Amino acid sequence: MRVPEKYSTLPAEDRSVHIVNICAIEDLGYLPSEGTLLNSLSVDPDAECKYGLYFRDGKRKVDYILVYHHKRASGSRTLARRGLQNDMVLGTRSVRQDQPLPGKGSPVDAGSPEVPMDYHEDDKRFRREEYEGNLLEAGLELENDEDTKIHGVGFVKIHAPWHVLCREAEFLKLKMPTKKVYHISETRGLLKTINSVLQKITDPIQPKVAEHRPQTTKRLSYPFSREKQHLFDLTDRDSFFDSKTRSTIVYEILKRTTCTKAKYSMGITSLLANGVYSAAYPLHDGDYEGDNVEFNDRKLLYEEWASYGVFYKYQPIDLVRKYFGEKVGLYFAWLGAYTQMLIPASIVGVIVFLYGCATVDENIPSMEMCDQRYNITMCPLCDKTCSYWKMSSACATARASHLFDNPATVFFSVFMALWAATFMEHWKRKQMRLNYRWDLTGFEEEEEAVKDHPRAEYEARVLEKSLRKESRNKETDKVKLTWRDRFPAYFTNLVSIIFMIAVTFAIVLGVIIYRISTAAALAMNSSPSVRSNIRVTVTATAVIINLVVIILLDEVYGCIARWLTKIEVPKTEKSFEERLTFKAFLLKFVNSYTPIFYVAFFKGRFVGRPGDYVYIFRSFRMEECAPGGCLMELCIQLSIIMLGKQLIQNNLFEIGIPKMKKFIRYLKLRRQSPSDREEYVKRKQRYEVDFNLEPFAGLTPEYMEMIIQFGFVTLFVASFPLAPLFALLNNIIEIRLDAKKFVTELRRPVAIRAKDIGIWYNILRGVGKLAVIINAFVISFTSDFIPRLVYLYMYSQNGTMHGFVNHTLSSFNVSDFQNGTAPNDPLDLGYEVQICRYKDYREPPWSEHKYDISKDFWAVLAARLAFVIVFQNLVMFMSDFVDWVIPDIPKDISQQIHKEKVLMVELFMREEQGKQQLLDTWMEKEKPRDVPCNNHSPTTHPEAGDGSPVPSYEYHGDAL
């Protein structure tokens, strides 16, 4: 091919824009009517105002960006350097080098310095050229820009012309709006009036977004087909495929396009993994702030969604979906629904807490513990260094325990179990509404072939396996990875997960030893104020240690889970995401909840008794619960871990890390020379600005934060009724934080179609079921609710709780202490102690079977187990009943979906009938005129208006 002379006389400043593999333009069959690659050479003088959103011609929109690093000779940007690189490219293409290609530099002069090329970089460049040539063959249009403000970084701009968009939309079965518009059935009667009133009331908190307004009409959507283009509204081809859809189509082509040299054969994913390209992303629509910024969807999202000043408004979910795609839109819709459902849970939780505050002075057990007249002397909390102590000194703890350990918490546990079931049903119904609005009904069947596209890593392993078989002269048909190929990875996964869980348990054990040793050390302190606050000090510091460890291990476990999933080599992206989610959730669940499980179910259970305590490593005596029980400590543990995790890990990191990165970039800029600094502050192209943003890492971390929080809200809600309130306050901030991160700090993600939240829904259901069981055990074994009921109905003399505290305490003769375990200062209270008390159901020292477990213990245990069984089955039944009563699909949505199907059938019936009539008319005109009129004549009807017979054609075919 010889390039026309008019394309080789470009000014030098325009030659940095070159088209890879331009030698194949004629061979590829590009026609001028379809927008040839050569059009990019006619530079629009106004194109610079587009700031990188369009090609140099100012007409073709940039749909995708590929970024690569290239080496420059001492950072220079000389034309000779570009000419040398261009000639090296041409040397691999069998193209005449005596005439420059469009946009290329002229051949290098003899005096130009020769630049040595690194073999590895040269190899990457060759692979880029081959890959970009294959993209050209796929119909995409490319434009290269290496003359950027970012040293050593080149950009490949990709544009998908109309015929490529149509072809790929048909292949992907994208549902596009047709010309047919129908009215959405409106509610009538009282329901319509209620909806109208609610709309007026909520109007101030609605976002000022066109997509958020109630729609009375809807366009009928149908999978795009080039044969049926007449059905679609193609009056404006530029806006028919929006930027989200265009980038999705280009990304699918990038994934399918292969690079056959050596092992790089799996498309853009493999090329990114091997460093051939350093990044690939679609562009944002433009800037989001500034006085002279052109209005765009990104700016609208920033003003109506991603600003803290609109925290009280509803989210413009339809606009979020339009800009980021269905998968991101579903995440924010789910987060909004979850936050909305937290409002009633928070209100009930606050009422339960206020009930505890109002009745604290009427609680007889705490009053007895605070009454110094009872003069109850308790046994030492540790060996030797700890002394005897008065129960009245734990008065504050007992009163605080009542705030969370009262009959209302049982009701709240039942309420939250039903709340979780209602939330799941509410989300399923909302999800169906979104599927209808976003034309995702029937999506799963249409996407079956596309979603099973193998991952690049899987294809690489299959290729490696097939090459091994070829070397052994074996059959290579239908090579795939079997369980034998994956067994080492599965074994590594199992061992690693068990090891990580063991590490978590070991850390919890270390914190337990810290608590025991610290309590003993503080007990030796001479200050009375220090000794009186031992429990609070030890609990608070231990929880803070747990919090720091949890935050650190969360990051470590996230990386380990991703590595373990990678070595499994899942076949599809969906399989990879599900396996990664399961591993990460398992490890982070164990990491977050193990300290809480210890306090709730193990602390104080294996202590032993005075004179026969249980020791760890024969040195550390197991911890005991406070006289009021471990529920208060569980509440402290929950609140600090939950609030600290949300404040530090979720919010502070998300705000602080981007600010820190900006500050580091500012410091680097100050170190640069004045000329480089002046060039840096110049306005960059859109693709240069987006390159400096953080890459999108998926939604798994976002979902994980909320699922762990959902666990805090539901699993131990019996001990912390304020958890929904703190979760609500956090989520109000979290929504805007995530929104601002997506709009301002992240590169625009590729829009991915999805009709649900995937495996996260099953995890939510599992957490909800587990919450019923855990709350049953917390109420039964951790709180004093069951012992109080047993005492009230079996042992109380007057039907009140008077004497309950004394009933739960056993007696111990101090002469039965083991050698070396008695207090060093037995007269610390000012008198000699002969009998001390400890919390347990055991026989007294004067009994025949002294210190054995008493009958009261077995009565309470039986009542506890009975309560667990009754509570679990009753709440499970009520949850399933709620699930059964509430239909998954709203009735109006079901009717609208049915209406769409009927309209679609009618549309195609009319189309087929019209085709048949046209065919019959054409056949009638083609009949020979010498044929008698009575042969093959149609049925006549004399009722025509003009008296002439009217032909009637019958259609017996199937319309669809």
Swiss-Prot record:
Regulation: ATP and calmodulin are essential for its activation. Channel activity is inhibited by CFTR protein and by chloride inhibitors such as niflumic acid (NFA) and 4,4'-diisothiocyanatostilbene-2,2'-disulfonic acid (DIDS). Activated by heat with activation seen at temperatures above 44 degrees Celsius. Activated by BDNF in radial glial cells.
GO biological process: cellular response to heat; chloride transmembrane transport; chloride transport; detection of temperature stimulus involved in sensory perception of pain; establishment of localization in cell; glial cell projection elongation; mucus secretion; phospholipase C-activating G protein-coupled receptor signaling pathway
Compartment list: Apical cell membrane; Presynapse
Record annotation: effect of changing residue 712 to A: Decreased threshold for activation by calcium
Disulfide bonds: 370-395, 379-836, 382-386, 625-630
Ranges in the topological domain labelled Extracellular: 355-406, 515-542, 603-631, 780-866
Effect seen on changing residue 588 to A/Q: Decreased permeability to chloride ions
Effect noted on mutating residue 645 to E: Reduced anion permeability and increased cation permeability
One GO term describing the cellular component: plasma membrane
Positions of post-translational Phosphoserine modification: 196
Keywords on record: Calcium, Cell membrane, Cell projection, Chloride, Chloride channel, Developmental protein, Disulfide bond, Glycoprotein, Ion channel, Ion transport, Membrane, Metal-binding, Phosphoprotein, Synapse, Transmembrane, Transmembrane helix, Transport
Binding of Ca(2+) 3, residues: 425, 883, 888
Membrane topology: Multi-pass membrane protein
Role, per record: Calcium-activated chloride channel (CaCC). Plays a role in transepithelial anion transport and smooth muscle contraction. Required for the normal functioning of the interstitial cells of Cajal (ICCs) which generate electrical pacemaker activity in gastrointestinal smooth muscles. Acts as a major contributor to basal and stimulated chloride conductance in airway epithelial cells and plays an important role in tracheal cartilage development. Required for CFTR activation by enhancing endoplasmic reticulum Ca(2+) store release and is also required for CFTR membrane expression.
Stated name of the protein: Anoctamin-1
Organism: Mus musculus (Mouse)
